[in-house]
Amino acid sequence: MLTIYRTTLFVLSLTVILPLKAATAVTGYLSAEQRQIATLLPPPPSTDTPQNRADLQAVLAIQANRTVEQIAKAKRDDHLEDAAFPFAREIFGPTFTVDRHPLTAALFRRVYQDFEQSLMPAKAFYGRPRPYEADSRVKPLLPPPEGDSYPSGHAMDSYLTALLLAQMVPEKRSALFERAASNAQSRVIAGVHYPSDLEGGKLAATALAPRLLANPQLQADLQRARVEVRTNLQL
C-alpha cells in the first residue's frame, strides 16, 4: 500500500512539474526561415589555397607569441558566449547584473535562442575543421568546442550582443564593439578558430541583427530593456 501511495504521489508531482516547465520554456523571436543565414555568408577559404594557408600561419604565429595575460584572457572569454552581462560589465560597471536587469535578461534569453538556431546550421553548412583538427601543430588552450569552425560562434555572439546593447546605450557603442573584437580575437589566441572564422561570425551577426530588429515583439522588449538599463546606469 505504501509503495502504491508513493507512486501515486510521484505521478501527481509530474503532472504539476511538467506543465510548469513547458510554460517557462524560452523561445526566440524569429521563425525557422528567418534564422537561416548560412548562404548570406562568404564561404571560408578552401583547403590547399593560399588564403587557407595564410589563415593557418596566422594561428601558428599567434600561438608562438601569446603571452600569459593573453592566455588567461582567452580562457576567461571562453565563458562569455550567451552571457551579455559579464560581457558588458567592465563597460557598464559592476551593477550591470541579471538581478538588477530582469527585462534585459529576458530579452537576451530569447535572442540567444535565435542566435543558437542560426549558428549551428551555418557551421554544419560549411563544415570547416577547427585549426587543431587540420594541423597538429596547433595546440588549443581549451577543450574542443561544439560544432565546426566557420563561422565563429563566440564572434557572432559578441558582435550581436554589442549591436543590441548599443541600441540601448549608443554612448558606449565604440567600447562595446572593441569588447566584441577583443573577445573574438581570444578564439584565435586559444587556437580554436582561424581569423577568417571571426570575420564570418561578425558577418553572421550583422545578417541576423536586422531581422531581429525588424521583429515587433523584440522592438517592444528592447524599448523596455533600454529604459531599464539607462535608468540603472543613471543615463
Describe each PLM feature range:
Residues P129-D135, L160-A162, L198-T206, R226-V229:
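Short alpha-helical linear motifs
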Residues S182-L213:
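Interfacial helix-loop-helix junctions of multi-pass membrane proteins
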Residues T8-P19:
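Bacterial N-terminal signal peptides
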Residues T24-A190, D221:
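Hydrophobic alpha-helical bundle signature of multipass membrane enzymes
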Residues M1-L9:
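Bacterial N-terminal signal peptides that target proteins for export
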Residues A209-L235:
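C-terminal membrane module of polytopic membrane proteins
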